[in-house]
Amino acid sequence: MAGFAAPAELSGRLGETAGDGDVVAAACGYWARRGLETGPEGVLLAPGGGALLLALLAARGGDILVPRPCAAWWLPQARLLGRAAHPVPTPAEYGGVPDPYALMETVRRVLREGGDPRVLVLGVVDDPTGTVPEPEAVDAALEAAAGCGLTVVVDESLRDTPHSPHHPLVLSPARAHPDDVVVLTDLAGALLPADWPLALARFPATPAGLTLRARTADALTAAGARPAGPLRAPAARALAEPPELRARARAIARAHGLVARAAHARATAAGAFALPPRAGRSLLVDLGPFREALAARGVLDAVDLEADLNARLPFPVHGGHRFGDPLPALRVRMPTAGLLGPSPAAREPALTSPDPLALPDPRRALSMFEAVLRDLAATEPPHAPGTGHRQDGTGTATHAGRDSRDTGTGTDAGTGTGTGGRTVEGAE
């Protein structure tokens, strides 16, 4: 529900009394409907995905590995703990999961350098690209992680956001690997409004899994991190998935998908790189092909690009450096909520319109985005055939501006390619 107001079905329950047990029982039912039988002893609640991941990493210890790029809220948790975070390239066709061979090589390198790799975080729907990794790719990453002795945390916060009802369901890796995967689901933005922080974790029903759950619960208790009482009843209702909420969720996903595909079409037609989005609420656009035109404007890296585009567009964008990308990579994440309108109230008509792209706000936002792209394309000098700009500003252009062969380098969680401690505003 990111970018939209809370429906009365949820906001009207803020004053109702509910306990953690009500939310846990609803969560068990939510997972059971997706083929993932879950007992209450394996479920843990927290006030938001960031707090839950922070506690889980504190409980497990060691370095973490993440696909590059990754969700903006993953890396800061490692930084807060003073842990090293090591980005791993993804396959060229989609994000969310690391290339298995690159993962194994990264683990070997970290071990040679004296590191302590213990946790891999991946996503079944990739934020920021909006892509969905194939189940075979997820399985390959999990097998590689198991061979490296890594604990796998799967972020399933966006699993219920496919843009089209005709797309295959997003499956949980925990169905095929029930003893090896910790499932993390941030309800804020998916089943609840984005500013209602409540998250769930499902731990394997094994001695090791339940021990990790207990240690994670201890970390949350030590931090005084408990879900806000008024959110428990709405969360339990959202997890029960009554028909009216399911219909609204489908309408929201459809609206995000329409503007995401429209922006993708405009970006690629102008010569930029972008993977076709299938789910979620964002699009990652690589403007590397316009490097010289951007340099003429003083735009040399992702920080400059973010500032330049935010001054020219009516909606916010965020530089790829906030998502673990190298600073020289000229990529930005576009939250699709901004394309639908400047406020939740302005976006609401898109849920019922037969043609949301014809509404004034989406039409204006897409038109301005297209104008910026046309300007860059018109001022970019021609390049010799077969040359272009890779994500780091050198070499040959790759599919969607990314190359799974680039193994990258590890980054210290205190420095490098994260957000630098800044909040990613509007990253809905």
Model-identified regions with their sequence ranges:
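PLP-dependent enzyme catalytic core of the Aspartate aminotransferase-like
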Residues: 308-317, 323-395, 399-406, 416-428
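Conserved core segment of the aminotransferase class I/II
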Residues: 180-251, 267
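Conserved core of the PLP fold type I
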Residues: 10-144, 160-175, 358-363
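Helix C-cap/helix->beta junction micro-motif
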Residues: 81, 147-148, 177, 270
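Conserved glycine-rich beta-strand-loop-beta hairpin in the small C-terminal domain of fold type I
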Residues: 250-264, 273-293
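Short Gly/Ser/Thr- and Asp/Glu-enriched loop/turn motifs at secondary-structure junctions
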Residues: 39-41, 230-232, 276-282
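Short, flexible/disordered intra-domain loops and linkers
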Residues: 93-98, 130-132, 162-168, 211, ...
